[in-house]
Amino acid sequence: FLKIAEVGAGGNKLTLSMSVAVEFRDYLGDFIEHYAQLGPSQPPDLAQAQDEPRYYMDLKENQRGPGLGSTQGQTIALPAQGLIEFRLIDDYGVEEEPAELPEGTSLTVDNKRFFFDVGSNKVSEVKPTYRFGHTFCK
C-alpha cells in the first residue's frame, strides 16, 4: 500500500511544479528499485475496497510551463509495472534554487475566492458553501 495524499471533498485535482515532481519521483525511487528486484508473484484474490482514493498522474504543459497533474478518483492505482515511468521526470525535471517568496494574496474568480499563502505553501478555495485548502510539501 502506497499512500500519496489525503484530499477532502471538492479538492480532487493537484498540480505539482516540475521541481516538486522530481522530489516526488525520488520518494518513489526506493519503491521502484525494490519492485524491480521482486520476482513474478501470484497474489491472492483480494476484495477491493470501494472507498479508497485513486490518483491519476498526467505530465502536461500549459502557458506557465510543464507540470505534473494529479487527479483524485475513488481508489488508489499505481500499477507496479508503470512505476518505472516516473523516471521520465529526469528528462523534464529541473533543480531550482530556493527563491525569495512574495507575500500571500487572494484572487476572486466568479463565485470563488482563492487565498495563496506562499509562506506555508498553501492554497485555500472559498465558496459560499464551504472552504477547502491544499498544502503542498516541498
Swiss-Prot record:
It comes from Rattus norvegicus (Rat). Pfam families: PurA. It is found in: Nucleus. This is a probable transcription activator that specifically binds the purine-rich single strand of the PUR element located upstream of the c-Myc gene. May play a role in the initiation of DNA replication and in recombination. The modification Phosphoserine is found at residue 70. This is Transcriptional activator protein Pur-alpha. GO terms for molecular function: DNA binding; DNA-binding transcription factor activity; DNA-binding transcription factor binding; DNA-binding transcription repressor activity, RNA polymerase II-specific; double-stranded DNA binding; double-stranded telomeric DNA binding; mRNA regulatory element binding translation repressor activity; purine-rich negative regulatory element binding. Homodimer, heterodimer with PURB and heterotrimer with PURB and YBX1/Y-box protein 1. Interacts with FMR1; this interaction occurs in association with polyribosome. Keywords: Activator, DNA-binding, Nucleus, Phosphoprotein, Transcription, Transcription regulation. InterPro entries: PUR-bd_fam. The keyword Metal-binding does not apply. One of its GO terms (cellular component) is dendrite. The gene is Pura. GO terms for biological process: cell population proliferation; dendritic transport of messenger ribonucleoprotein complex; epithelial cell proliferation; lymphocyte proliferation; negative regulation of DNA-templated transcription; negative regulation of transcription by RNA polymerase II; nervous system development; positive regulation of cell population proliferation. Belongs to the PUR DNA-binding protein family.
